[in-house]
């Protein structure tokens, strides 16, 4: 009989209190109680010459919010624009999002996007381009059922995962091109559970099929075991009962991604503080009106996402404009396509609303001052980000020092009897 996740010795569950503690610990040490500028090297980098250990590049993190008011379409459109900009700036028409990021985290619709863009196909390249991923979201959004992926969840049992099975086949987390973090809410433990490539590399007990990971993070059946999505590890030893999806568990996974990098010295030996990171956090629009229970859930999710944005922006401090980019739509700007209830809006109109959000002025979080409207639009911020990502890749190609990222390699598949 399969054991629930809580029975496994290694625990990849990210408790929200722990996440808050981690990110605000950074705030305390860096801004609130004095600043220690001395570098803190991870164990794998302590014995290196200072010129090598301190001369590396930045770890590039991509974080994608849950559905938001655009059901994932704003993030999909942002990533399509970013991928096109990367192709243009790098001169490589085959460049993909996964080529320019070291870590990807996504929740809900954002988790599905991350899986589409970072899962390896038979040719060793991502199975979807950003444009194909956007079209996948648009085609499978569903217009008559509340929430994201209505078409995917009209039937129960095995039929529910038919589309994900067709897309991902038997690919598992080990097939992710880069470290991947995708959360859901686990009924077995009553806490968020994060599917992680790093944990999958350690043991088959944490290696899940990507199709089940996507079902889990996009689940919207409510917290009843009869409607929960079941995800089992490839060895059958770990079972996750996912309900409410990743959007309720961790709507904005940026803090989880940062915590993962700063506490993973094996794969990121030179990442000692937020100054060593380049973070792109992609939102999915905020609700500006609500009437039903699910709308209150959405607005609560928006509030949590904003809180994470504020915390991360504060952690970066003066470097927030060069190391941290947040792309988010603001429905309070008097848009003619203002979104009151995305489930009642057809996909074409929602796509137009997402396009308009990209033309809005970017909104930045400022230390102790809330938010301010930036001079650049969201589109211009994406263009700037593309330039930073291309420069970072070129810098790494020209540097012969210690790699910024040393990914764990997949070990031979162990049997279910292996401890």
Locate predicted features.
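Conserved catalytic cores and adjacent C-terminal regulatory segments
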Residues: 2-419
């Amino acid at each position: 009989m399969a054991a629930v996740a809580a029975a496994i010795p290694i625990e990849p569950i990210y408790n929200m209190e722990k996440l808050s503690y981690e990110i605000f610990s950074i705030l305390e040490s860096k801004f609130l109680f004095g600043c220690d500028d001395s570098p803190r090297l991870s164990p794998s980098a302590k014995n290196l010459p200072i010129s090598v250990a301190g001369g590396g590049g930045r770890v590039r993190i991509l974080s994608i919010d849950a559905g938001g008011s655009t059901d994932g379409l704003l993030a999909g459109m942002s990533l399509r624009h970013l991928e096109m900009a990367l192709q243009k700036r790098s001169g490589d028409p085959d460049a993909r999002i996964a080529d320019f990021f070291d870590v990807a985290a996504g929740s809900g619709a954002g988790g599905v996007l991350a899986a589409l863009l970072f899962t390896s196909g038979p040719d060793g390249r991502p199975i979807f381009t950003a444009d194909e991923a956007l079209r996948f979201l648009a085609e499978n959004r569903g217009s008559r059922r509340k929430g994201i992926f209505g078409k995917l969840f009209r039937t129960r049992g095995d039929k529910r995962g038919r589309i994900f099975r067709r897309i991902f086949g038997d690919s598992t987390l080990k097939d992710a091109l880069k470290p991947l973090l995708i959360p859901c809410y686990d009924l077995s433990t009553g806490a968020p559970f994060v599917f992680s490539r790093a944990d999958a590399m350690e043991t088959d007990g944490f290696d899940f099929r990507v199709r089940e990971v996507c079902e889990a993070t996009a689940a919207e059946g409510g917290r009843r075991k009869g409607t929960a999505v079941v995800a089992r590890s490839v060895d059958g030893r770990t079972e996750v009962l996912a309900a409410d999806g990743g959007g309720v568990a961790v709507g904005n996974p940026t803090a989880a991604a940062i915590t993962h990098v700063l506490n993973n010295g094996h794969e990121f030996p030179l990442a000692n503080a937020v100054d060593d990171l380049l973070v792109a956090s992609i939102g999915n629009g905020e609700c500006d009106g609500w009437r039903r229970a699910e709308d209150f859930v959405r607005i609560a999710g928006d509030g949590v996402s904003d809180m994470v944005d504020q915390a991360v922006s504060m952690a970066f401090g003066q470097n927030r404009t060069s190391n941290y980019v947040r792309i988010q739509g603001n429905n309070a700007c008097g848009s003619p396509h203002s979104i009151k209830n995305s489930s009642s809006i057809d996909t074409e109109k929602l796509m137009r609303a997402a396009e308009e959000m990209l033309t809005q002025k970017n909104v930045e979080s400022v230390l102790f001052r809330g938010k301010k409207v930036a001079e650049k639009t969201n589109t211009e911020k994406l263009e700037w980000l593309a330039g930073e990502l291309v420069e970072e890749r070129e810098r790494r190609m020209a540097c012969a020092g210690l790699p910024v990222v040393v990914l764990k390699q997949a070990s031979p598949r162990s049997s279910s009897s292996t401890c």
